[in-house]
Amino acid sequence: MSKIFFRLNLVRNSLWRRAASFTSYSELKSLTPYEILELPRTCTANDIKRKYIELVKKHHPDKMKNASQLAPTESPPEINKHNEEYFRLLLAANALLSDKRRREEYDRFGIHWNQPSHPTHPSPQNWSQARYPTYSRSRRSAGMGSWEEYYYNSYDYMNDQNASNKNRKFDDEGMLVFAGILSILVIINIYSNYRNGKFYREARSAAIGRAEDNFDYYSTGMADLSKDDRISRFLILREQSKQIPTQQKPSSLPPPERALPAPTMPTPSS
């Protein structure tokens, strides 16, 4: 238990020293986002993220709440007020410097950081309260003063939500593109099957026509011939079809002359 009190005293003393260094709101709000995060202007995105997590854990209002409950008479009321304001500015500074475009605009033109040191811009209270709700004592007393609340009220949650929405939009667009490509492939397949079927029907019709022509070619005049004559004529036409190219084959032949009956010889009378 003594170790716990010792650590809480260290936390309370560090918070008191931090608050004592800013004797008024004007001095606290005159700091730049780099000064809030205790980083140089040449810091990288990883430096900002690392320092932000470190300072959030160090200056979270829940720590001050626990220290005030254990030793309320030793904690001046200005500490809570100053640390809440500092924590709010910490969230705003991280939101600004984590955005590459806004950070470049701030470095060049001094915009996006609406502090009293820039009188041409609106007051910081209206700007910050719309994006970063202050940590109210009533919410803390109701058990709502957790790190999750600050996360959902901070710019980190907004960035995560925006990234999630962008990913969801990208997934939806990807599904639409995939569905479009699949539809095109199905249409191409159906059209290809239609063309193949049409070609097959035309080839089949042409083959049937050629078969009918060949049948007419071989069967013309067969009805008027005897069985032996039909066999002889078929053999002759088959031999001729082997010698004559198909494209030069006549479509029909004139009917053969009807064979005359052999003359009968008179029988001698006895």
Curated annotation (Swiss-Prot):
Residues 242-251 have a biased composition (Polar residues). The keyword Chaperone applies. One of its GO terms (molecular function) is Hsp70 protein binding. Pfam families: DnaJ. PROSITE patterns: DNAJ_1, DNAJ_2. InterPro entries: DjlA_DnaK_co-chaperone, DnaJ_domain, DnaJ_domain_CS, J_dom_sf. GO terms for biological process: ERAD pathway. Transmembrane segments: none annotated. Keywords: Chaperone. Residues 252-270 have a biased composition (Pro residues). Residues 43-112 form the J domain. Residues 239-270 are annotated as: Disordered. PANTHER family: CO-CHAPERONE PROTEIN DJLA. This is Uncharacterized J domain-containing protein C4G9.19.
